[in-house]
């Protein structure tokens, strides 16, 4: 947010990750967010190295997997990051250092950590995360990781020998689940997830 404001570039609505600058029809940089429209735009501009399979059946499966990643893997990530105290403390401590100066005064860091943690934990209901649904989300994630691991043992990517837009969508969420948040990281390591080596 601060970087875009410093460049006098209008903030995207809503602010999601990733955010990249793409030029509009007048060659003015515009902050563009959400991987799906970004990939679709890049597909049009750089058609020689596409991330969407040429085969219509595979392209359809790719869209389904990409949508699953955007809608459901996000729920896993948000649930694990903010539902459990250890994970929320971890994220609340680190995220202010990503968005703000690394050398925040201790008091200011503590205030930002408290604000972010409270804001995000109060939004858990948006992704369907609660004490009542926690076990269901956990079982679903473990089932997903087990199936993904079996697939990745046979194939380096979701749809074959090269990455697709579905792989990129999976990567965004799985990089956090495998590397950043303590609870899902342990689950992935317990499953010996092949992907964790590649992230």
Residue ranges and their predicted role:
Residues 75-199:
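GST-like fold's C-terminal all-alpha helical module
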Residues 1-107, 158:
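GST-like domain detector, emphasizing the conserved glutathione-binding G-site
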């Amino acid at each position: 947010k601060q970087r875009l404001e410093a460049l006098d570039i209008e903030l995207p609505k809503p602010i999601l990750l990733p955010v990249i600058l793409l030029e509009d029809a007048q060659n003015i940089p515009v902050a563009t967010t959400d991987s799906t429209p970004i990939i679709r735009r890049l597909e049009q501009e750089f058609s020689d190295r596409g991330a969407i399979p040429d085969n219509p059946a595979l392209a359809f499966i790719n869209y389904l997997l990409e949508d699953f990643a955007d809608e459901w893997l996000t729920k896993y990530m948000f649930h694990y990051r903010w539902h459990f105290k250890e994970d929320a403390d971890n994220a609340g401590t680190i995220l202010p250092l990503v968005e703000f100066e690394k050398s925040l005064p201790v008091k200011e860091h503590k205030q930002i950590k408290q604000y972010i943690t409270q804001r995000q934990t109060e939004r858990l209901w948006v992704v369907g995360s609660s004490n009542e649904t926690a076990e269901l989300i956990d079982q679903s994630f473990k089932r997903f990781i087990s199936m993904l691991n079996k697939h990745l043992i046979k194939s380096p990517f979701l749809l074959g020998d090269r990455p697709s837009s579905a792989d990129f969508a999976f990567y965004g969420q799985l990089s956090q689940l495998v590397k950043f948040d303590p609870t899902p990281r342990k689950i992935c390591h317990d499953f010996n997830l092949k992907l964790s080596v590649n992230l």
